[in-house]
């Protein structure tokens, strides 16, 4: 093996070429000669995988005939050459591989092929060692009924009064390549592989849009995104594991908290971790609440019932909630104030030392639910809703024989507001109205038929109404209905080149107002409620839609408008 390896090195290092090493990219060639790197790239036999053989045996990898030993060695040769280009090269004409070269189809951009192969190996090693539990299989079978965008908001409204404080923060989209290497250092022990990956990341191969489109595999930026945010989510889950579980419960059973939080890590991301395509194509946006009580087994519940008398109600309900959409995150706890300051410093040190951020204490905000120091006007944007914690005064008048007793009870109320200004900006960008909210015709839909135009407007209107069915300011939905209704009428008038009166005579005044009722699930899942339409009863009931799973694009567009505001 050593003799063959030395001959292979001499064959490519001592090749008779008149070129000189000029670019920094040519230094990448020497990293390919490591023994552990070949089994990652060349997927020939199980024996050649080395220490990664157990990983590749578990996954049924479809062999791509365009990615072979010979093609990658040709890529290495092109790195060493001076005239590096994307066109096909025939440099094996005087070698014994000339006959095999005719059967192979060399890729036009070999550097990008190698770059994609490295990220494939990263995802295999990160994801393939994890097994599904019975709880996770049962969870994904009922995925359509249980997963919803509005489910975290509904549970937050139901349980937020038990939370004494919380944290809210936001982190940037951009990160340094060394941060990714620092994260991958936990899984990889191959130093040459990490150095080669560092070279690729510092060359910014993946940044330009033109290079990403020509890569044969899926988008590489989503892989870097997922690796980065998986590290952040695992940190917050580990904080809650060490911070929320009471000491008396841990004394009863040592594995009590570990068994609970292992299920949380499997249940976190709403993307099956063993599916290889989802990690490339989709970004991981968790919309679920991590609750230490609802995920316990039957045995753990028996232990909890046995110590109910010894633990108070607040210690027993050590519920924490962690939310994250895109870059915004929330954590709600039940602890005292001195411990909150330590937790805030812990989070800041993680962002500074682990992720290389330059943060101050003001970057992580307090979201105190029961505190007189909280500002009533403070609002937080989350899941395309505006969260506020205003004070509500209840007036109580007690009538006695002699005089009246008047009392005021002040309590905190959580409110979910509809960001009407951001929705108007989004509709104006799509040419449904101007920036002030005055509707106008959609000129791009003039070539469609009348039924297609009406159906698309009603579909857009119903999606917005279903998404904001849980907001407290339902009057803002009337403004959205006004914009979409008159925009539909103006597009039909522009198509037929008539006035609005003719359109109302032809189609009627209830153009986009169709009577419909749909069954949805609210907080009490044992009962079915019907969502009453705005135009049927002139009032919309405030309910949570637990079947709303496909409006991620609306959330991300509104978040971009909120950041640019």
Curated annotation (Swiss-Prot):
GO BP of this protein = mRNA processing; RNA splicing; tRNA processing
Return the GO cellular component terms, semicolon-separated.
Answer: chloroplast
| Claim: Iron is one of the keywords in the record | no
Q: Which InterPro entries match?
A: Domain_X, Maturase_MatK
Q: Where in the cell is it found?
A: Plastid, Chloroplast
Task: Spell out the disulfide connections.
Answer: none
Which GO molecular-function terms appear in the entry?
RNA binding
Keyword Plastid attached: yes
Q: Which UniProt keywords apply?
A: Chloroplast, mRNA processing, Plastid, RNA-binding, tRNA processing
Pfam families linked = Intron_maturas2
- Similarity comment: family membership: Belongs to the intron maturase 2 family. MatK subfamily.
> What role is this protein assigned?
Usually encoded in the trnK tRNA gene intron. Probably assists in splicing its own and other chloroplast group II introns.
**The protein, known as:** Maturase K
Give the species: Staurastrum punctulatum
